[in-house]
Regions:
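Hydrophobic alpha-helical positions that pack around
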Residues: 127-133
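Catalytic Zn2+-binding segment of zinc metalloproteases
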Residues: 153-168
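An active-site-proximal "capping" alpha-helix that borders the catalytic cofactor pocket
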Residues: 55, 175, 179
Length: 275
């Protein structure tokens, strides 16, 4: 492990979040490998920047050229991309509220004002997974649909579909648009500019720019609901008072947020993740 860490120290590679240009909410990218995954240097060779540019431009088009996602940039103006290698092997199934979330938070990727989106060459069986505030894009499985799957996952990272989103089904999905199986490049009226002030609208997320005059933080909503259903994470979280929709306040059976996992999880939970 030590030897591998030395080999992986390459010029231009950052193992931690670099100083922020401002104190705003932002999406931070990570090139994540499992214990024995081959390092394809996607954080160094421009691959991640290229994919993020496609995500950014497509998202902008989907909003009707109104808003973009807020990304984390370094002081030199470049996209801030970190590198992380887990000390365990990849495993199929859910990575959220599981060892990868736990490991990355232990490495310091635990700022409540960030969404962490990891591009990984390891595999889980899915194309992507995300919730507030960690997410994963599994490059091999997502191949050919990376932009679509990334936007789909980043919507989950922003809390969508919400329990009150019209037509929500199969957890946090919809029957049509980017949050459906078809992954078509439209949000659908239920998600963006839906005109129901009692239920969150994507246009008001703190992770969009220009930012709404009355924005919401998806972590607050997801963690408040997680506490209600699972009694965790620890801390105080509030759903903004203006969101009075009964379905939102009640939540679904399975509500969670990935925040503060290291504060209540024990290593024993992750014994299926082989060292």
């Amino acid at each position: 492990q030590e030897k591998q860490a030395q080999i992986e120290k390459k010029p231009g590679r950052f193992f931690e979040d670099q100083p922020d240009v401002n104190d705003d909410f932002q999406i931070h990218f990570i090139y994540l490998l499992a214990k024995n995954t081959k390092d394809k240097e996607r954080d160094l060779n421009g691959w991640i920047e290229k994919e993020v540019k496609k995500i950014d431009d497509t998202f902008f088009k989907m909003t009707g050229d109104k808003q973009r996602l807020k990304f984390d940039y370094r002081e030199d103006g470049k996209l801030d991309i970190s590198f992380a290698r887990m000390d365990r092997k990849a495993k199929s199934g859910g990575w959220n509220v599981s060892y990868p979330d736990y490991y990355l938070q232990k490495q310091g990727f635990n700022n409540p004002k960030k969404l962490y989106f990891s591009f990984t060459d390891a595999a889980s069986g899915d194309g992507g997974q995300m919730g507030p505030h960690h997410g994963y894009l599994f490059i091999g499985r997502a191949s050919g649909q990376i932009t679509k799957i990334s936007i789909h996952e980043l919507l989950h990272g922003n809390g969508f579909a919400m329990p009150c989103t019209k037509g929500v089904r199969d957890g946090a999905h919809l029957g049509v648009g980017i949050l459906s199986q078809e992954l078509s490049l439209k949000f659908g009226k239920a998600v963006y500019e839906h005109n129901d002030p009692t239920c969150p609208d994507l246009k008001d997320s703190v992770y969009l720019i220009p930012t709404s005059d009355d924005p919401f933080d998806p972590l607050q909503i997801a963690c408040a609901l997680g506490q209600k259903k699972r009694n965790n994470p620890p801390g105080n979280y509030e759903i903004p008072a203006r969101y009075t929709h009964k379905k939102l306040l009640k939540g679904r059976k399975n509500e969670w947020c990935t925040y503060k996992l290291t504060e209540y999880a024990s290593e024993m939970w992750f014994k299926d993740w082989k060292k």
